[in-house]
Amino acid sequence: MSEAAKKSVISALEANEALHNSFFKYDAKAVEANAKKLKNAINAIEDKDVTKLLNFSKGKLSEIKASNDRETNNKNYHLVSMALIHIVNKYDVGSKYNAYSCPMVKKKWVQNSSKMAKVHNPYAPNMPHCGSKDTTH
C-alpha cells in the first residue's frame, strides 16, 4: 500500500472513531452524520484493492439513519466494522487501531487502542465495557 493510500485509510479509521463514539453514547443524529463522514472518507481512498474491500460497507453506511431503531443501525455498523477489521489486519496502518468483539451481542468493531485502552462496546449500553481486544497491532 502506498503512503498516500495509507494516509487515506487512516483518515477513514479516524472518521470511524467518531462513528464509534456516537454509537457508544448513542446519539442517533450524530450516528447518521458520522456514518456519512466515514462513507466520504472511504470514497477518498484511491487504492483499488482497498476500495474493493470497502465497497459493500459504503452501502451499509448509507443505511445508517437517525430514524432507524438502534438494532438496525448496530447490524449495519457491525458489517462495516467487519470490513474495517479486515483492512486493519491485512494492511500496515500503524499500531493504534485494533479489532474488538463482544461475545454477548456477537458483534465486532475497530477501536483506537492508544486513545481508549479500556473496551468501549458501541453496541450494548447495558454492558459498555463488555468485550475483548482481539488484535495487537
Language-model-derived ranges and their functions:
Residues M1-H137:
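Intrinsically disordered, low-complexity terminal tails/loops enriched in metal-binding residues
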